[in-house]
Amino acid sequence: MKILKVTLICALVIALTIPGFAEIQQRSGKVLEMKGKVDVAQIGGETVPAKVGMALHEGDILETKGDAWALIELEGIEKSTVEIDENSQLLLSKLEMDTEEGSQDTMLDVAIGKILIKVAKLRHEKSKFEVKTPTSVVGVRGTEFAVEVEALE
């Protein structure tokens, strides 16, 4: 009888906790276009040259050198594009979506350089799209805007 109670309690705890974790999924992005030398520092630590069609993931850092640029698409419930200008560095800090709820959470971190972002209108009230720089954070719900970060002295 005691084993049955322990088993039922464990099953109840598992049933109550798993659905909360199962709803959140990692989104991805991909390189749509590029010119010049664009590198991707992947979450595992390896830096590889970017290629058109290459998948991008949360934690990846894109860096453009010289006169290089890249256009990436962030996939999800609402798709957005980010154009990364020359001599820029962009971290894909957070790319999450809750498929059950229909919301998504995006955080981009611009260390240096300029990016042009086209954010699709966020339909769900809990959806977030934020861009962080060394001195500020901006959140939008659907617009087109540019962010430029110059070297701090």
Language-model features and meaning:
Residues 22-153:
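Flexible, surface-exposed loop/linker segments and immediately adjacent secondary-structure boundaries
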